[in-house]
Curated annotation (Swiss-Prot):
Record Gene3D superfamilies: ATP-grasp fold, A domain, ATP-grasp fold, B domain, Succinyl-CoA synthetase domains
Pathway: Carbohydrate metabolism; tricarboxylic acid cycle; succinate from succinyl-CoA (ligase route): step 1/1
The encoding gene: sucC
Cofactor binding note: Binds 1 Mg(2+) ion per subunit.
Enzyme class: ligase
Source species, domain of life: Bacteria
Record's function text: Succinyl-CoA synthetase functions in the citric acid cycle (TCA), coupling the hydrolysis of succinyl-CoA to the synthesis of either ATP or GTP and thus represents the only step of substrate-level phosphorylation in the TCA. The beta subunit provides nucleotide specificity of the enzyme and binds the substrate succinate, while the binding sites for coenzyme A and phosphate are found in the alpha subunit.
Name under which the protein is recorded: Succinate--CoA ligase [ADP-forming] subunit beta
Source organism per UniProt: Saccharopolyspora erythraea (strain ATCC 11635 / DSM 40517 / JCM 4748 / NBRC 13426 / NCIMB 8594 / NRRL 2338)
InterPro entries named in the record: ATP-grasp, ATP-grasp_succ-CoA_synth-type, ATP_grasp_subdomain_1, Succ-CoA_synthase_bsu_CS, SUCC_ACL_C, Succ_CoA_ligase-like_bsu, Succinyl-CoA_synth-like
Annotated ATP-grasp domain residues: 9-236
Length: 389
């Protein structure tokens, strides 16, 4: 789960990482009030979960509260890379002497944690890595040993931070590691980490990604979810404990097991090339349980997507046998009733497949078409989607 900048900086501050005072506003009057409370020049910053805010006009300096109100009016509602700005952060303006970069992240490729640091901050780190790779220090972090002052010093030295700020940066690194671990994050990033004219180090901007798999021990994660920004179908699926990701196609996908679902996306995309370019509309893995309730919940979510023109149910019977899956589909269609109007292509294979096919055949539901092979079923689902588009 990605956080907004203001949420990230609140987490930083709670762990002792130095940040500037700020307040969030959802309208221009609130922005003016926040600027009045802070006093002096402020920066009005769009709160969206994407980069490039400055180039898009989403970050503006305001010299006084009235100007903060005007700048907030210009930013609120701004579309930044498809993200609509619904709130702004009003924060104290700061003069900047130098800009740096620092992050901790989960290094999935090496199954480890990684620290990345650079004295070339303030720009996209991908740009630094591409144009000046020697300016980006990467240090592997042992998850057992973690980051103490000595390890933080090693990181700071590797990145060649100036000696006059090294002690401050070491302290920030230790506290940022505490944030990373305590909050179950997969990314904590400060860009830029700045030095002000007084020589003080400040986290001027922040990015945090939290591991939602840790929500059972991080109850406050629920308070950080932005209900307005969440896709309504994904929110509905999440409420039903379904592993669902919305895509931009026309063929709804239900499968059991992430690998099978990913393969299904591929074969549907390939089949769609012959049928007006239709594509998969979602990823939905129902896992090992294909009960009537789970199947009904999955179909309810997928059929709620107006872009979906057909649904492909692709199940390989293992621990959950095909007859149980078939019964689940039949019961799900009864539960959904008149809502189950879009064509449903079902491919069953594996444990008790013949019994599963018999159950579906006897149910004789007008929306259901059975196809024996995965490629054939994908082709049929794509054909039906193209016809209904």
């Amino acid at each position: 789960m990605d956080l907004y900048e203001y949420q990230a900086k609140e987490l930083f501050a709670s762990h002792g990482v130095p940040t500037l005072p700020g307040s969030v506003a959802t309208d221009s009057d609130g922005a003016k009030a926040a600027a009045e409370q802070l006093g002096g020049p402020v920066v009005v910053k769009a709160q969206v979960k994407t980069g490039g805010r400055g180039k898009a006009g989403g970050v503006k300096l305001a010299e006084n509260p009235d100007e903060a109100k005007t700048k907030a009016e210009a930013i609120l509602g701004l579309d930044i890379k498809g993200h609509i700005t619904r709130r702004v952060l009003i924060t104290t303006a700061s003069d900047i002497v130098d800009e740096y970069y620092f992050s901790f992240l989960l290094d999935r490729a090496n199954r480890n944690f990684l620290a990345m640091a650079s004295v070339e901050g303030g720009m996209e780190i991908e740009e630094v890595a591409a144009t000046k790779p020697e300016a980006l220090a990467k240090i592997a972090i042992d998850p057992i040993q973690g980051v103490d002052e000595a390890k933080a010093r090693e990181i700071v030295d590797a990145a060649k931070f100036p000696a006059e700020i090294a002690d401050q940066v070491v302290e920030v690194v230790v506290k940022l590691w505490e944030t990373f671990v305590a909050e179950d994050a997969t990314l904590v990033e400060i860009n830029p980490l700045v030095k002000d004219p007084q020589g003080k180090i400040i986290a001027l901007d922040g990015k945090v990604t939290l591991d939602e798999n840790a929500s059972f021990r991080q109850p406050k994660q629920a308070e950080l979810v932005d209900k307005d920004a969440e896709d309504p179908l994904e929110a509905k699926a999440k409420a039903k404990d379904l592993n669902y990701v919305k895509l931009d196609g026309e063929v709804g996908i239900i499968g059991n097991g992430a690998g099978l679902v990913m393969s299904t996306l591929d074969v549907v995309a390939y089949a769609g090339e012959k049928h007006n370019g239709v594509k998969p509309a979602n990823f939905l893995d129902i896992g090992g349980g294909a009960s009537a309730e789970v199947m009904a919940a999955g179909l309810d979510v997928i059929l709620g997507d107006p872009a979906v023109k057909s649904v492909f149910v692709n199940v390989f019977g293992g621990i959950t046998a095909c007859d149980a899956v078939a019964n689940g589909i039949v019961q799900a269609l009864k539960i959904l009733g008149d809502e189950a109007t879009k064509p449903l292509v079902v491919r069953l294979d594996g444990n008790n497949v013949e019994e599963g096919r018999r159950i579906l055949a006897e149910a004789n539901h007008p929306a259901v078409t059975m196809v024996d092979t995965m490629d054939g079923a994908a082709d049929k689902a794509a054909e039906l989607a193209a016809a209904g588009a």
